[in-house]
Amino acid sequence: MFVLPPPPPRYTIPVAYAAGASNGMAVPVVETNNVITKPEGGCPLQVGEGTYHLQDDLHLATPPPHPSEAPIINPNPLATVPTPPTSGVKLSLVNIGPRNKNPVFAMKESVLAPPFGDGNPALAAPAVKDGLKRRKPKNNIIKSSSSFVSRVITHEASTKRLNDRNPEGLFAFANINRAFQWLDLGSKQKEEPLAKILFTKAHMLSHDINELTKSASHIDVVMGSSAGDIIWYEPISQKYARINKNGVVCNSPVTHIKWVPGSENLFMAAHANGQLVVYDKEKEDALFTPEEPVKSSGQQPLQVLKSVNSRNQKTNPVALWKLANQKITQFAFSPDQRHLAVVLEDGSLRVMDYLEEEVLDIFRSYYGGLICVCWSPDGKYIVTGGQDDLVTIWSFPERKIVARCQGHNSWVSTVAFDPWRCDERTYRFGSVGDDCRLLLWDFSVGMLHRPRAHQASTRQRTSMITSNSQHASRHRADSAGNRARSDSQRTADGYDEYDQAVRHPVEPRARTALLPPIMSKEIGSDPICWLGFQEDSIMTSSLEGHIRTWDRPREGINDTYNAHASSSAISAGAGSGSAVANSARGSL
């Protein structure tokens, strides 16, 4: 009788994958599980509207290294060898069911800009044969033989859990080292992931969900990795596609990724080499050759290596822009879907009109790089955080700094506005950082104290604001023609007139208003990496995988809705004219 030999071990180096060895034999691999704790009365957040109580602490399991990775024993802290880029735990949240209440303080659809690439017929979406049925990726990730994916673990009762779940509950997607988890935060077993993907070596650094295409049967997720590869993932069908495979378009880690607002197919990825790339999830990749010559001087605020108006749109990328030689750490789309705020490791904040492919303004930090950025719900203000331990508020209509926010003792990793606590006069935002603290801030232009030294230069600054506002309101009819400038137009310092107009000098501290936090709380023992505000809660995640949720005080959220019940949504777009700027200046 012929007997087949046993299959070879799945892991070629079991000792490296196992926790250790006993008597020379490898210890069997034990899959670690998520753990949830519900502290009683622990870590409350005391704010004016009430107390935020900690609901639970979900600790994600850190996966062991892949067997192909040699274990690092006694690493040298002084070694100069570059280490692979990593990211703390970050969340992407989505609510499939209808929301009870939307934030009243939001941008009206009537002021939204046209879709990105709307004027290029080469980007027109082809007709869908199946009507409203969404296209899904082609490859089954569970049965994948790709060396990029190590394995996929799905919950044994995932189908039943999806059918029985509360439609108003939140889905969460979280990265931790080489693992990517799909969680149902509305479930009683929220610590049990619906699916967990283990990649071979790559770490997912950023991910995002397409709010336009989400439904009970379809969710589009994109995630960018430390290897530069991008995964388009549809969790319900467990299908996936690999984009920028082996760095064919851009061979650099993806530091941040977002779906382009209003688009079903396009998403934008920031790479560590200073490039912003727009991809189409349904296009094939091709080796990228710049359509415009690459300038190595680094003095241009934006080099368009491929324009969204290009007729060559058969393959990715759709557009590719070079901002700097430094790493892009994060970017954020404005609520009016026209502008883009980008922060870089070189300490600059760059505000773009990404529809016109031009940079409007460049601001600088006091020192060190900028790490995070976000827009206010009405698009009037931009908030950044960075390596100078400061949170900074910038006025977009006035093109200037408004205030520095002091309170952190280490780098600021994430800033976010709370749309349920914002109105026409007061803004609420939060920040977290490597000091393990969560800070909340209330900001109103009228409450800021202008230093006396600042008042002396009001006239000069007003003229600068007017000049910059007029410049920002101009749109070039032919971006390609205006982008080409002769050497005769350049000034003695190497920058042309356009560069000088958008580069703002650093405002001295003596002339900058300071804003203290309304709450500062140390919420853990490891750095905090992410912050999010929900209708009924505040959520954070940390470097070691702690996802904490605080319930809002009922009286606070109810008072907010009652105060706004008779008001209408904002109809004025960001930077819509001098009226916005004049009102802001009058409040100061």
Swiss-Prot record:
GO terms for biological process: carbon catabolite repression of transcription. Interacts with creB. GO terms for cellular component: cell division site; cell tip; nucleus. WD repeats lie at residues 249-289, 323-364, 365-404, 407-451, 523-560. Keywords: Repeat, Transcription, Transcription regulation, Ubl conjugation pathway, WD repeat. Belongs to the WD repeat creC family. InterPro entries: WD40/YVTN_repeat-like_dom_sf (IPR015943), WD40_repeat_dom_sf (IPR036322), WD40_rpt (IPR001680), WD_repeat_creC_regulators (IPR051362). Residues 452-499, 569-588 are annotated as: Disordered. It comes from the Eukaryota. PROSITE patterns: WD_REPEATS_2, WD_REPEATS_REGION. Component of the regulatory network controlling carbon source utilization through ubiquitination and deubiquitination involving creA, creB, creC, creD and acrB. Required to prevent the proteolysis of the CreB deubiquitinating enzyme in the absence of carbon catabolite repression. CreB deubiquitinating enzyme stabilized in a complex with the CreC leads to the expression of genes such as those in the proline and quinate pathways. Pfam families: WD40 (PF00400). Residues 455-471 have a biased composition (Polar residues). This is Probable catabolite repression protein creC.
